[in-house]
Amino acid sequence: MLESDRLISSQSIVSEDAMDRAIRPLSLSEYVGQDSVSSQMQIFINAARKRNDPLDHVLIFGPPGLGKTTLANIIAHEMGVNIRQTSGPVIERAGDIAAILTNLQQNDVLFIDEIHRLSPVIEEILYPAMEDYKLDIMIGEGPAARSIKLELPPFTLIGATTRAGLLTSPLRDRFGIVQRLEYYSVDSLTKIVARSAHLLGVPTKPEGAREIALRSRGTPRIANRLLRRVRDYSEVKGNGIITVDMAQQALEMLEVDQHGFDLMDRKLLLAVIEHFNGGPVGIDSIAAAIGEEKGTIEDVLEPFLIQQGFLMRTPRGRIATSKAYQHFGFSAIEQE
């Protein structure tokens, strides 16, 4: 099973890109949540515009689905400049990054998603471009190879990554502004769901929006996906208005519970509790018990359960916490 196969996946899905762009906020005033990031960026942007300078290079990191691409687009919009978007794996050759950089206009934004996946060769080209707005590339091969130096217009590089630890120190040190995006509160997600519902023309009661937010794992991308599925359900099974009852019925049908767990999350936790007395249990035993690959458990299922305090990863194996027992209605005696 892939992460992108799950309804509550925080990974981007190509078929949703167009709709996500339609509901994406364009200004910091519309950017709900991440209050510290918003207030800091507002000051940095206003200062850069006053000086008519490009904004310092920005690194945005955090879990997937929290709005790194959205924030990059907002920064460009607030600066009143164009944005060029690409991703680390796409830039394979020196000519690729050279073509992108030489087509930028003054103070434009270059947004590189998954920047931790840039090759060392591309990073080496970026260093002088970021520091001195100069491009130094080799043309040709062997004895005929020659170095060409080009002046670049001042620009802002915005890098986004879910794995900041994989960035090399020389690249990380060249970002003047570093922002971490955190998981969203239920209140912030409720506002996001209500705003998206309004833009999509979906009548939604405040309690209905909150019910969706509660099950969205702190992630706007998941909240917007669940909103679209609840909308479908309410149009077929109800009168098209998303109430709290309609949201609960739809999400129960979709097997997303009040903690945002899906069937596989619950299957894993129940296996640890019922088959292995709460653990500790090795990953191979869990994989055999639930019929899932070891890599999928480690990379897809476990992270959120651990982050929410339902599962512990120890040297002896996985252990279900008291929260996991309470979630399934097991008593303290049964837990022992």
Swiss-Prot record:
Keyword DNA repair: yes
Chain residues that bind ATP: 23-24, 65, 68-70, 131-133, 174, 184, 221
EC number of this enzyme: 3.6.4.-
Residue positions binding DNA: 313, 318
Biological process terms in GO annotation: DNA recombination; DNA repair
Hydrolase is among the record's keywords: yes
Region (Head domain (RuvB-H)): 258-336
Protein's cellular compartments: Cytoplasm
GO cellular component annotations of the record: cytoplasm; Holliday junction resolvase complex
Catalytic EC class: hydrolase
Molecular function terms, GO-annotated: ATP binding; ATP hydrolysis activity; four-way junction DNA binding; four-way junction helicase activity
Keywords, in A-Z order: ATP-binding, Cytoplasm, DNA damage, DNA recombination, DNA repair, DNA-binding, Hydrolase, Nucleotide-binding
Amino-acid positions noted as binding Mg(2+) in the UniProt annotation, renumbered to this chain: 69
Record region (Small ATPAse domain (RuvB-S)): 185-255
Substrates-to-products reaction catalysed: ATP + H2O = ADP + phosphate + H(+)
Gene3D superfamilies given in the database record: 1.10.8.60, P-loop containing nucleotide triphosphate hydrolases, Winged helix-like DNA-binding domain superfamily/Winged helix DNA-binding domain
SMART domains: AAA
Sequence segments annotated as region (Large ATPase domain (RuvB-L)): 4-184
Assembly notes: Homohexamer. Forms an RuvA(8)-RuvB(12)-Holliday junction (HJ) complex. HJ DNA is sandwiched between 2 RuvA tetramers; dsDNA enters through RuvA and exits via RuvB. An RuvB hexamer assembles on each DNA strand where it exits the tetramer. Each RuvB hexamer is contacted by two RuvA subunits (via domain III) on 2 adjacent RuvB subunits; this complex drives branch migration. In the full resolvosome a probable DNA-RuvA(4)-RuvB(12)-RuvC(2) complex forms which resolves the HJ.
Stated role: The RuvA-RuvB-RuvC complex processes Holliday junction (HJ) DNA during genetic recombination and DNA repair, while the RuvA-RuvB complex plays an important role in the rescue of blocked DNA replication forks via replication fork reversal (RFR). RuvA specifically binds to HJ cruciform DNA, conferring on it an open structure. The RuvB hexamer acts as an ATP-dependent pump, pulling dsDNA into and through the RuvAB complex. RuvB forms 2 homohexamers on either side of HJ DNA bound by 1 or 2 RuvA tetramers; 4 subunits per hexamer contact DNA at a time.
Domains: entry comment: Has 3 domains, the large (RuvB-L) and small ATPase (RuvB-S) domains and the C-terminal head (RuvB-H) domain. The head domain binds DNA, while the ATPase domains jointly bind ATP, ADP or are empty depending on the state of the subunit in the translocation cycle. During a single DNA translocation step the structure of each domain remains the same, but their relative positions change.
PANTHER family (UniProt xref): HOLLIDAY JUNCTION BRANCH MIGRATION COMPLEX SUBUNIT RUVB, PTHR42848
Family as reported in the entry's similarity comment: Belongs to the RuvB family.
Protein name: Holliday junction branch migration complex subunit RuvB
Native source species: Legionella pneumophila (strain Corby)
